[in-house]
């Protein structure tokens, strides 16, 4: 199911209310587990993970990082809503790629007893939002989780997995650390994210420079995501799509916000710089092709939401093929008989 939400990024409101959180559960300090910049041998090395760590650290060190948290807080709240929908308690939870703790701030200690938060950016962990849930922050890579098998009742992840080089391995790691009958609830950017910006940059660069380079990072297709979750061992899968449209004053304000979110491109094949006239042309193309009636420009963020369970004997299972005792033909005849009886 596709839902679209439209938000407005109004720069007059940059100094909005700061996020507050209780201090009932004092968080632990970051552990000595270092983030890994390497990838597994089978992975394509698409992203510069060290650059992504620097980008996220830079964003977390800004004087008011909450100015750029609007999208991540929105998705964090939606993941928390899905956790509450499960209607059970989770004594031990894990947030992978937590950033400043965008999911935990929307959870409560009645539902989650204790949470471990991991990220590759140490400054994001140091500046994470405090909640009343006992919290331990650990510096760790999404592809190399430092936890034993069958540890967590719940694993969550919000807008982080689209930057890993080996998504299959990351999902396998999540499945590995979950307890039997544990659940993974996550969200990541989808393939149509920022299509307006991608198209505008490509058209302008082709016109001005005779070709174009990728300036928007590649994203996973929704059909592939369900397959990868199943291959990692998850069952009872749910994958759905949201679109969030945010309106900005212009293209340069959009790019400034992406930098403030720590979401700038970190692909190895990225072009370091674009010429000034190419950027101005891209901004003009963006406004010409996509602008709203009020002069603002929209940016679309496609979100893939996913839920997957680790197998347990208590879970419902599909019946074996050929075990049915009633055919569809029998049901059709029964329906006809009941219809005639009503007449």
From Swiss-Prot:
InterPro entries: Malonyl-ACP_OMT (IPR050602), Methyltransf_11 (IPR013216), SAM-dependent_MTases_sf (IPR029063). GO terms for molecular function: monooxygenase activity; S-adenosylmethionine-dependent methyltransferase activity. Arginine hydroxylase that mediates hydroxylation of 'Arg-111' of NDUFS7 and is involved in the assembly of mitochondrial NADH:ubiquinone oxidoreductase complex (complex I, MT-ND1) at early stages. May also have methyltransferase activity. The keyword Glycosyltransferase does not apply. This is Arginine-hydroxylase NDUFAF5, mitochondrial. It is found in: Mitochondrion inner membrane. Its main location: mitochondrion. It comes from the Eukaryota. One of its GO terms (cellular component) is matrix side of mitochondrial inner membrane. Keywords: Membrane, Methyltransferase, Mitochondrion, Mitochondrion inner membrane, Oxidoreductase, Transferase, Transit peptide. Its EC number is 1.-.-.-, 2.1.1.-. Residues 18-40 are annotated as: Disordered. The keyword Transferase applies. Interacts with NDUFAF8, leading to stabilize NDUFAF5. Interacts with NDUFS7. Interacts with PYURF (via TRM112 domain); the interaction is direct and stabilizes NDUFAF5 protein. Belongs to the methyltransferase superfamily. One of its GO terms (biological process) is methylation.
């Amino acid at each position: 199911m596709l839902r679209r939400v439209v938000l407005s990024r109004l720069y007059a409101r940059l100094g909005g209310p700061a996020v507050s959180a209780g201090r009932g559960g004092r968080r632990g300090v970051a552990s000595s587990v270092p983030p890994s910049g390497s990838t597994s041998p089978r992975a394509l090395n698409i992203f510069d993970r060290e650059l992504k760590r620097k980008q996220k650290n830079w964003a977390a060190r800004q004087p008011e990082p909450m100015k750029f948290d609007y999208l991540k807080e929105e998705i964090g709240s939606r993941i928390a809503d899905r956790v509450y929908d499960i209607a059970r308690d989770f004594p031990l939870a894990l947030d992978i790629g937590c950033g400043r703790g965008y999911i935990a701030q929307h959870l409560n200690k009645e539902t989650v007893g204790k949470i471990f938060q991991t990220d590759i950016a140490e400054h994001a962990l140091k500046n994470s939002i405090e909640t009343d849930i006992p919290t331990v922050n650990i510096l760790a890579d999404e592809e190399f989780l430092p936890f034993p098998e069958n540890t967590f009742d719940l694993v969550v992840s919000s807008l982080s997995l689209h930057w890993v080089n080996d998504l299959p391995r990351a999902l396998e790691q999540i499945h590995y650390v979950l307890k039997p009958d544990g659940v993974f609830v996550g969200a990541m950017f989808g393939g149509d994210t920022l299509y307006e910006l991608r198209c505008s940059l490509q058209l302008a660069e082709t016109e001005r420079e005779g070709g174009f380079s990728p300036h928007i990072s590649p994203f996973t297709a929704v059909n592939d995501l369900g397959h990868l979750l199943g291959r990692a061992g998850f069952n009872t899968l749910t994958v759905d799509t949201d679109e969030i449209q945010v309106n900005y004053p212009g293209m340069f304000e959009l790019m400034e916000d992406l930098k403030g979110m720590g979401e700038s491109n970190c692909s190895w094949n990225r072009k370091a710089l674009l010429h000034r006239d190419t950027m101005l042309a891209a901004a003009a193309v963006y406004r010409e092709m996509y602008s709203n009636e009020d002069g603002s420009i929209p940016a679309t963020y496609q979100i893939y939401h996913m839920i997957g369970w680790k197998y347990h004997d208590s879970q419902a299972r599909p019946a074996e093929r050929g075990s049915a005792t009633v055919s569809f033909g029998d049901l059709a005849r029964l329906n006809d008989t009941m219809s005639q009886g009503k007449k």
